[in-house]
Every structure is written in C-alpha cells, then in structure tokens.
Regions:
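Conserved glycine-rich "GG(E/T)P / GGGxP" loop and the immediately following alpha-helix
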Residues: 26, 48-83, 92-108
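A short alpha->loop->secondary-structure connector
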Residues: 86
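Short acidic/polar active-site loop segments enriched in Thr and Asp
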Residues: 4, 53-56, 90, 115
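Hydrophobic alpha-helical membrane-association signature
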Residues: 35-39, 76
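Acidic (Asp/Glu)-rich catalytic clusters
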Residues: 108-114
C-alpha cells in the first residue's frame, strides 16, 4: 500500500495580508459553511480513488485555516477518517495566525485530533 499526505487549502482569512501571495479571500461565514460542505462531498465522491493509499499526514494550509470553527474542521476530519485509509499515527497540522489564536481554540483543536 502506498503512503501519502493530504493537503487541504482553506482560502479564508480574517483580512488579506499585503505580503501574502497565496490565494485567499476574506472570511464570510456563509461561504465557509458551503466550502466545508463541498470538501466533504468531494471526499465522499473520491472514496474509490483514494483506496490504494494510506495517509499519514493531513495538512490544513491557506489562507488561515484556523478561522474555521472546531465543528467545521471536525466535519472535514470525520469525512477523511470515514472515507480514507488513515494511519493510526497520523500527523494533523493546521496553520494559524499567531495574532488571532487563543489557548482555548488550540485546546479545542487538540480535542478534535489536530496534533
């Protein structure tokens, strides 16, 4: 079985930084919910194409993925764990803006499996 990683680009930011060259848009809650639903749908649609690989890393990049709520991230992670072969020692990483993150939010991310 092949091993690989999963990169999920979360294009949302609280504000657009002038130095950033990555694709991003400013945070709009209705857009984020629709985006998360589309990611989950895409994971389900591609289940058969993802079967021959074990995934040992999941990386949420962006944008600023930490603008997503714990529930939104948990929804994505549940879809991945339910439809992909995930290594039991998976590394799950999430980019955060240090000026916008709190200990409470980091603790909640840890509770849903982001390590």
């Amino acid at each position: 079985m092949n091993k690989s990683g999963i990169y999920l680009h979360i294009p949302f930011c609280k504000t657009k930084c002038i130095y950033c060259d990555f694709y991003s848009v400013t945070k709009r809650e209705d857009s984020i919910d629709k985006f998360v639903d589309c990611i989950v749908k895409e994971i389900k649609l591609n289940k058969g194409r993802l079967n021959n690989t074990t995934y040992d890393t999941i990386f949420f990049g962006g944008g600023t993925p930490s603008v997503l709520s714990e529930n939104q991230l948990d929804k994505i992670l549940n879809a991945l764990f339910n439809h992909c072969d995930i290594d039991q020692n998976i590394e799950i990483t999430l980019e955060c803006n240090p000026g916008e993150i709190s200990f409470e939010k980091l603790s909640n991310f840890r509770k849903i499996g982001i390590n």
